[in-house]
Amino acid sequence: HPASFLDLMQNFTLFQPVDGRLIKKVARYQQYRAVNKVMERLMNGTTRKEKSGVVWHTQGSGKSLTMVMLAVKMRRDPELKQYKLVFVTDRTQLDGQLSKTFRDAQNETIYNAGSVAELKELLSKDSSDIVTAMVQKFQEAEQEGDFTDLNPSDKIIVLADEAHRTQFGGLAMTINAALPN
């Protein structure tokens, strides 16, 4: 399929600098399929439930790269490029790696929330920024309270990498209260 090949070249081939060389990374099948399924849901879903979901990939399958490829493809789509993207991770190393990978792929400013106050400010802004935050910032916000209705926009996507705690319980309620749509 020529269209699939072109899509693979345009949206699923990234170059990352490593030790002074550029390394080409091309999506594996599960990454290609996951990104396109998410894009389909975002473009065709009419409710929050229809637009949301979980992508489950095994350890070492390239989940972070899948998220970066999704962001790259969204930024190239006229309907989805205005979305704010919020990356939630559970490890400092993963947070830094994700920011660097996206910066290398897209050459776009990434805003890292270093505190709860900074996170509130970044989430409140009505913009198409890319924000990264450690899951601990949401936990701290949950403990502090006053983290509701920060941004009512329906043009916000939260992508959690290895942050299972964001899916259920109090932490999920905190994120949903802050970003209700």
Give residue spans per PLM region.
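Acidic/polar loop patches that form or flank catalytic/metal-binding clefts of enzymes
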Residues: T109-G114, R165
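Conserved helicase ATPase motor motifs in RecA-like P-loop NTPase domains
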Residues: Q59, E162-R165, A178-N181
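Basic, amphipathic juxtamembrane/active-site segments
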Residues: V72-K73, D77, M173-L179
